[in-house]
């Protein structure tokens, strides 16, 4: 981008935490992004570009806050654990994380429509900054979802608009066939991360089974208690 100074750009990075969830950090200057990456991310990064870090989500947020930045949770609700609203984070931890960041992504072109609706509702409830993104891994995706604001055509001005709640989001999801093709292409290019990703999938599946089983047991206990005390309203 240094060759095209007349094109407004925003330096940013998407990071995968130790838990497997994603976070976006946007910076006001390229030098800030470079320093953040070299000092706080690269030493804890796996060998592949798609590898997760060894840092927890809280540690990443803490490091990002050391710089002038805008911190966003992308696709907070999605199919697996890449969004922060998943079973790897209990309610208390999730609430603390959502309080710590600047905002959430409310429309993601690669996400499923019903999950985007939940993301949009979350954004309204939090009353924080909102963004949208194409999650573009090919030219077809670019521009499917955009974030816009009435501000100067500079990166810092756009970041300020987002942070101050002056940004709007418009767009729609790509079709299912395109989603499948995009996911397949990413897996082929980054096959080296399969072992780590498989491990995360297994751990998350175990977590889902554990939580769902506990919920079912709780519901059965409650049903049994109500049936047992049906004729004893004072008990």
Residue ranges, per PLM feature:
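Histidine/acidic-residue-rich catalytic or RNA/ligand-binding cores of hydrolases
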Residues: 19-24, 82-92, 114-117, 139-152
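Short acidic/polar capping segments at secondary-structure boundaries
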Residues: 76-79, 109-111, 137-138
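Residue-level recognition of alpha-helix initiation/capping sites
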Residues: 55, 113-114
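Short, aromatic/basic amphipathic alpha-helical patches
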Residues: 1-3, 118-122
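Extended substrate/RNA-proximal surfaces in nucleic-acid metabolism proteins
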Residues: 1-105, 201-234
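Acidic/histidine-rich catalytic cores of soluble enzymes
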Residues: 104-113, 122-123, 141-142
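C-terminal functional module detector
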Residues: 58-70, 121, 126-129, 134-235
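Structural recognition of alpha->loop->beta junctions
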Residues: 87-111, 147-163
